Amino acid sequence: MFQAETVCLKQIQSTLRCIDFSKECTIEITSRGLRFAVEESQSLQAHAFLDKSLFQTFNFQGDSDGDTYMFQTMISPLLQSLSIYTDGKERISTSAWDQPTVNIMHKRGVICKVQYNGPGCPFIWEVEEMAGYATACELLTMECEDDVDINRLASTLCTKIIMKSNWLYDALVELDNNMGENLIIHTSSQKSTFLLRCVGALSTTEIEYPNEKSVLESFETDSENTYSYRFSLIRHALKALQVGSKVNLRIDENGTLSIQIMLVGQEGLCTFVDFCIVPLDLVSEDEEEDEEEEPAESNQSDNNVLRNDPNYRGDAETEDEDS
């Protein structure tokens, strides 16, 4: 059984909106918090983590600390329900509600109760006001078809970069205007450079960051590396980069890219969103293998590329120490 209460509705909604691009969402509840995961095209997994510190009360009943609840549902109805209280202009036109902080929620007596009673039960979010109004959202849940591997990167990292998220956002938006299909990321340990390139039909655009503390808070790369990624997958991270504070870019030895973004709320509480993207060469290899397999076999092997690496590891909520 899981029960919790929170007044951080604005921050929770802003975080979950960053991964609201897939119909189905896998939710994992542990004693440390809630993790929401979505995926696309067997090449992208996005995770949003809500730490237990966002909740005023957090009651997770399990036999041990390692116990979890995992199920699938849709989060779009939940976001629509929360928008009644977080999108000020839709509810009331006062300036106070244009920026509904945690303190305002306390003053108005707005509190959200979250409940999940186990397999087969709905995932319930109920928002109550001191005035007596209440909004309940019951999300139907389904068992996960496969165990969702929440670990993302291999143990060996070849590149790690920490910078302001809005700087990366501005660069990606400019590159996206080039109408290219792929994003190329190049790092060099000798030249200490971090370069982004997009090749369009009419021109090529490059943006290079020098290894300076005023630009890159942290820059680590073991050698000269160049990887290419589908821009259509990178675009899913733009919403989080636009509202984020810092971004932690990591590339492992297989070329898998992790874009981990820290979102800081008005009360100083942090949430994390992580986008894990497979490079184009791995995507091509996986597609070729699917074409070579017999139809009967291919129907039995529809596994996500991101789950095939047994050395995958890393939790989004622990990266705030690095940031």
Curated annotation (Swiss-Prot):
Transmembrane segments: none annotated. GO terms for cellular component: checkpoint clamp complex; chromosome, telomeric repeat region; cytoplasm; cytosol; nucleus; site of double-strand break. GO terms for biological process: DNA damage checkpoint signaling; DNA repair; meiotic G2/MI DNA replication checkpoint signaling; mitotic DNA replication checkpoint signaling; mitotic G2 DNA damage checkpoint signaling; mitotic intra-S DNA damage checkpoint signaling; telomere maintenance. Gene3D superfamilies: 3.70.10.10. It is found in: Nucleus. Residues 297-306 have a biased composition (Polar residues). Residues 284-296 have a biased composition (Acidic residues). Signal peptide: none annotated. It holds the Pfam family Rad1. Its main location: nucleus. Residues 284-323 are annotated as: Disordered. The keyword Nucleus applies. Keywords: DNA damage, DNA repair, Nucleus. The keyword Cytoplasm does not apply. It comes from the Eukaryota. PANTHER family: CELL CYCLE CHECKPOINT PROTEIN RAD1 (PTHR10870:SF0). Belongs to the rad1 family. Recombinational reparation of DNA damages induced by UV and gamma radiation. This is DNA damage checkpoint control protein rad1. It comes from Schizosaccharomyces pombe (strain 972 / ATCC 24843).
